[in-house]
Amino acid sequence: MIKLKDLLFEGHNDTDDSGGVLYICYDKALLCLGADSGIWNIPKGHIMIGEKPLEGSVREFTEETQISLSGIPELANSYKKDNGGTFYLYVLKGTKKFTPRLDHEHTDWGYYGKEELPDPIDDWVKEVIENEDIAPELIS
């Protein structure tokens, strides 16, 4: 039987769940270009053991952009991943255009409106941005 403390000490402190924050400022979404994947996406990552999905999603956003969010992101959607975990997507609408300081996981960033999304972009993120029920401020 595997104990929680053994998982933590072996470096396995992530769950199968993950989450991210879609930050929207003046009808534009903050997106980052993945260093390994070469795909535009939102700042996201694994949720650690003991974290709530919102906590993990905000932590990942801050780690990957060096931006401290002022506001509480709202859960916009979630889906089951192939590994059995759940991905949680949060949205935060703000009026401040932050300049992220990227970490090793990203090579570029930008704010993009619905009609100017970069390519290649994660299919699910693109769908979420284009879905007026989830991100109405991005609708032209």
What are these regions (language model features)?
Residues L4-G11:
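Proteolytic processing junctions in secreted/extracellular precursors
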Residues D6, G20-L22, K28-L31, E74-L75, ...:
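A generic structural signal for ordered secondary structure
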Residues G11-I42:
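N-terminal strand-loop-strand
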Residues G45-A135, I139-S140:
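Unchanged
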